[in-house]
Amino acid sequence: MPNSSSNVIDGRAIANQIHSETAKRVEYLKSKGVIPGLVFIRVGEDPASVVYVGMKEKMSAQLGISSKTFVLPEKTPQSELLELINRLNNDPSVHGILVQAPLPDHISQEVVYSSVSPRKDVDGFHPLNVGKLLLGDKSGFKPCTPAGIQELLIRSGVNTEGADVVILGRGEIVGKPMAAILCQKAKGANSTVTICHSRTRNIEDHCRRADILIAAMGVPKFVKAHMVKPGAVVVDVGVNRVPDPTAKSGSRIVGDVDFENVQPIAGKITPNPGGVGPMTIAMLMQNTVRAAELATGIAL
């Protein structure tokens, strides 16, 4: 049984490795007169979105990526947002466009994601990039969180080949693309994948046979110790705000995994925060630099 924090995967440390690699690519592009450009679009003042965009802006600056944020009022018409995206699609100084979710109810997320040029879709949500992912076509952009989880597993020495992977959650951002990535005939994949969701029967039984358990349901501390096979790798993707009278804000963020009780049983486990989150940003930066390389034909 693991003790202390010896089995905890340090997502921040691995993300920093990737940032170092990305920074070298940025330096090379700049030496050739190309500055990678990333634009964030935020509609409304969702508190979490403000924080997330701020973190991405900060990392862009640290890596030498030029970033700009457009903040639109909550009641902005969809047509106005699409006009902005079209302008950015045609701006050669912009290599990546990220529309921060969630969007207001009157704006169709599907329409917005489809309007971003696939060549600038650094989030990996355009239908063309989703299709490429399913086909195993590596020319597209992978969604940042699933791609970050795969990289986390690879760099942590987790063998995914032939592994029974259980993914909790069937969402478009994590669950479905994660399954597609791990099914590929590729490094860090070749897994046998099961997706569980709210209608899954005997979900605990599925969890208990997982060699790798990826929790992305959005249910606080859903994964309990009795649901985890001893020695399994547990990845916690959940971001859930729960009341906490002891916190200044009156709430705190917890994951989908009961970390304190699962950690002693797991072979490896990601903390939350400090696990998947930093990897998501690392992959966004990597996608942006790759978009700049593809747009200019310049690469290290």
Language-model segment annotations:
Residues 27-35, 87-92, 157-160:
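Glycine-rich phosphate/diphosphate-binding loops that line cofactor/substrate pockets in enzymes
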Residues 43-57, 137-233, 237, 242, ...:
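Glycine-rich phosphate/diphosphate-binding loop of Rossmann-like nucleotide-binding domains
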Residues 49-93:
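Active-site cofactor/substrate anionic-group-binding motifs, chiefly glycine-
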Residues 2-34:
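Positively charged, low-complexity intrinsically disordered leader regions
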Residues 28-38, 45-62:
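N-terminal glycine-rich anion-binding loops that anchor highly charged ligand groups
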